[in-house]
Regions:
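Extended acidic/polar, glycine-enriched regions
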Residues: 1-7
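Aromatic-lined carbohydrate-binding/catalytic grooves of carbohydrate-active enzymes
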Residues: 8-175
Length: 175
């Protein structure tokens, strides 16, 4: 409790039915689910999007075009181009539709910095270098960053959520 503080009761909407699927991988599929929910009068308070980004691009909708920026940079809507993005052509409009249905939106994400395939994700490489340089990830006693072992997200970094600066950086990247 010293680390996290006392437990706080979550808002009421947290206790309602949640809609979620790892198979909704585009705005059209999500909009179809909203229509089905309305047509069949399925009660829900939350819609969870799991496939909104891939696991390497952790802070923006997948397929958004942008310039590569230093790892300290936090992208805003105006910097992201969805012109050629057929899967998520307008995340802002989709979020508004979800809200119009009276739902809260949760973007599911593993809180990791995934090791990208060499050269395929230059922005992820910038973000990882910045996190390591600033000790925003869990570090080994040797001073090297801890990397996930075999299995899920092999080679990925874990963000150090006990570091207030790491938390602020992570939150700013998602704002």
């Amino acid at each position: 409790q010293d680390l996290t503080g006392p437990a706080i009761t979550p808002p009421e909407w947290c206790f309602g039915p949640w809609m979620s699927s790892n198979r909704w991988e585009c705005a059209d599929q999500v909009e179809e689910q909203l229509a089905q929910m309305e047509q069949h009068q399925i009660p829900a308070t939350v819609l969870v999007l799991e496939r909104w980004s891939d696991d390497t691009i952790f802070d923006r909708f997948e397929d958004a075009s942008h310039h590569v920026e230093p790892g300290s940079h936090c992208f805003c809507d105006e910097e992201l181009d969805f012109t050629h993005n057929r899967r998520w052509p307008s995340p802002r409009r989709l979020c508004q539709k979800i809200q119009e249905h009276g739902l809260k939106l949760i973007l599911w994400q593993a809180p990791i910095l995934r090791l990208p395939p060499d050269g395929q994700y230059p922005q992820a490489e910038q973000d990882i270098a910045y996190a390591i340089k600033n000790h925003y990830c869990v570090m080994m006693p040797s001073g090297q960053p801890f990397r996930c072992a075999e299995g899920w997200f092999k080679g990925s970094l874990l963000l150090d959520f006990t570091n207030p600066k790491a938390v602020a950086w992570w939150q700013a990247k998602h704002a």
